[in-house]
Regions:
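Compositionally biased terminal segments of proteins
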Residues: 1-183
């Protein structure tokens, strides 16, 4: 695992501008490629910071106006903030958040889902990039597969629209991880 100690450009300038907009502490619960690349060291392109939560909610509109796809900060830096509404995180994910780049910003607090929770947010979409991210995380952490299964069963499965499909997806993911470990 090769996490970044310093945010590279254009991320640093983009997030510094968001930090200046915030009058008090703002927490961004980050998921997706931004977390996998910046915190866990995967080398792949990403142009957005996927966020599950902007807290307090009162700043979400201000952030949306300037930082979303097509907004002024996107025009300036080519990266954007994406408020994700379709990814389902495990129920207790907030209890396991970890801060990314502590003390980098005055008001902005970037929080990352733990690697198991991060992987499980990718379960429903299950595109190739998601599967590659999960296999990468499973390799570098390395995942305890029983913990992944348990968290899925207890904290995610009860809240899914099609749990039987996601049962199969998780089973296939675990088989792929086990194959990677055997080779």
């Amino acid at each position: 695992m090769c996490p970044r100690k310093v945010l590279p450009e254009p991320w640093l300038s983009f997030l510094n501008e968001l930090d200046r907009i915030a009058a008090s502490t703002v927490r961004l619960d980050c998921i997706g490629g931004f977390v996998v690349t910046m915190l866990y060291g995967l080398t792949r392109p990403t142009a957005d910071v996927d966020v599950l939560e902007i807290a307090p909610l009162s700043v979400a509109d201000a952030f949306s106006k300037v930082a979303m796809l097509g907004g002024p900060l996107f025009q300036k830096y080519g990266v954007y903030l994406d408020r994700v509404t379709v990814a389902q995180p495990p129920y207790e994910y907030e209890t396991r958040l970890q801060e990314m780049f502590p003390r980098t910003f005055q008001n902005l607090c970037l929080m990352a889902l733990d690697p198991y929770d991060l992987a499980l947010t990718k379960l429903e979409r299950n595109i190739e990039r998601d599967r590659n991210d999960v296999r990468y995380l499973a390799r570098i952490i390395p995942f305890e597969l029983d913990l992944l299964r348990e968290r899925y069963q207890i904290e995610l499965r009860p809240y899914l629209g099609n749990p039987k499909r996601e049962d199969l997806t998780l089973k296939l993911w675990i088989e792929a991880i086990e194959e990677d470990r055997a080779s």
